[in-house]
Regions:
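Conserved, mostly hydrophobic/aromatic
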Residues: 48, 70, 92, 124, ...
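Structural preference for beta-strand elements that scaffold enzyme active sites
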Residues: 64-66, 87, 106-110, 130-132, ...
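Flexible loop/turn segments at secondary-structure boundaries
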Residues: 73-76, 97, 164-165, 209-213, ...
Length: 411
């Protein structure tokens, strides 16, 4: 008996009316008319809010939620999320300015990322946001700039933990890493620092992202709390905050299922009891794609249909220049398909023959869907890529080959 092939998770986050996909109550044709564009990203803010509600339903209320702007820095989205989260995490001076202009209090904004340049460090100090220090030299530069500006820099140390997140889509801790300061080195230097030269906030322990295994995340949380307690114990000044990282993923590929936060939340409740000193601090989860990826779609028009030696290609006006991660060139080792649909033929039975969807670029890498079963496609149909609310336009080479940039809309 043949084993059934794995399938994508159900994309049930959007409404469908008469076979027409709805984003924020609008059909794709309506969105196209509103934008006067035939290829675009659309984000449904009710889906973002639903993801935030899922987080709060399961995670202890004492743990704050910050949005990592890098996942999607679309300004209308940032503004919409401002009242829904308790802080923003940024990775550049531009993102810092976006966060400030949203109205988020500066003390609820943190700046992480390796190789920060002097103008970025200076801007963060002047703005009064928390710098997540990634190296000893970066710390020295921040202190020196603070002295020159006569402003104490607000500093938290990003920790490169010795443990590593199992089954992580992107490992950002454990072993040698460009991120943070090795935990064993922090144990050496924290007792020796002159804390009068800066405002010490705490620690940022980030171990990975895009994980769909609650057992692995629970294990990482256990290690994170234990490490945070050790760091607090050897730091000769009070700790205010600990950023616990993120790590929570969303299902992109066949066989993947949505993460169950219930056991993760129950374990966190036990950890708060086990570590009463930590429970009194400001604890933060920093999430990006978990909050916004499910809320976004990428829609392009099918403008040509061709058959090459028996295989059908749906030719579209969109491609990897707009959506690099979907093409498999943003971290995948072996390309796998995102969930794909014909957006104006939702619910219709797929044809038996598999088809591929491609874009206009002169490279075989420009593949939107590879050998997938879809309803019978016609010219003018909408090809929709789900799970596209994170790492989309700003993570893609939009100037490659000179094609037009993609439009975005939040509804």
């Amino acid at each position: 008996m043949n084993k059934a092939s794995p399938v994508h998770a159900d994309m049930h986050q959007f409404e469908v009316k008469d076979t027409q996909l709805q984003i924020g109550g609008y059909s794709l044709d309506q969105l196209a008319s509103m934008l006067d564009k035939q290829v675009f990203y659309a984000y449904d803010q009710t889906v973002v809010k639903a993801q935030i509600d899922i987080f709060h339903r399961h995670i202890p209320a004492s743990i704050k939620l910050h949005y990592a702007i890098k996942a999607n820095p679309y300004m209308p989205l940032i503004n919409a999320m401002r009242p829904w989260v308790e802080g923003f995490d940024v990775a550049s001076q531009k993102e810092m300015l976006m966060a400030i202009q949203s109205g988020m209090p500066n003390r609820d904004i943190s700046f992480a990322g390796p190789a920060k340049q002097l103008p970025e460090i200076r801007a963060a100090i002047v703005a009064g946001i928390t710098l997540h220090i990634e190296s000893e030299l970066e710390f020295e530069r921040a202190v020196k700039l603070g002295q020159e500006l006569d402003i104490k820099p607000i500093i938290a140390f990003r920790v490169n933990p010795a443990f590593e997140l199992k089954a992580s889509g992107m490992k950002m801790g454990g072993g040698p890493k460009q991120f943070g300061i090795d935990e064993e080195r922090l144990f050496e230097i924290l007792p020796t620092l002159d804390y009068s030269q800066f405002e010490f906030r705490g620690f940022h322990i980030f171990w990975g992202s895009q994980n769909l295994k609650q057992e692995a995340i629970i294990d990482a949380h256990n290690n994170t709390f234990a490490l945070a307690q050790k760091l607090i114990d050897i730091t000769p000044t009070p700790t205010v905050t600990v950023n616990l990282g993120g790590g929570m993923g969303i299902p992109y590929f066949p066989g993947e299922k949505r993460l169950d936060l219930a056991p993760i939340g129950e374990n966190l409740k036990q950890l708060l009891k086990q570590y009463p000193q930590l429970a009194k601090l400001e604890l933060i989860f920093e999430l990006g794609r978990f909050l916004v990826a499910e809320a976004g779609i990428y829609a392009s028009r099918i403008t040509d249909i061709k058959v090459s030696r028996g295989h059908t290609y749906l030719m579209t006006n969109g491609g990897l220049h707009h959506h690099l991660s979907n093409s498999g060139n943003f971290g995948q080792v072996i390309r796998k398909n995102y969930p794909v649909a014909i957006g104006n033929k939702m619910g219709l039975a797929p044809e038996e023959a598999k088809v591929s969807a491609v874009g206009p670029l002169c490279t075989p890498l420009d593949t939107l869907a590879d050998k997938m079963q879809l309803p019978k496609a016609e010219l003018g149909d909408w090809l929709v890529i789900f799970q596209s609310g994170a790492y989309g336009p700003t993570a893609s080479p939009q100037d490659f080959l000179g094609h037009p940039h993609v439009s975005e809309i939040l509804v």
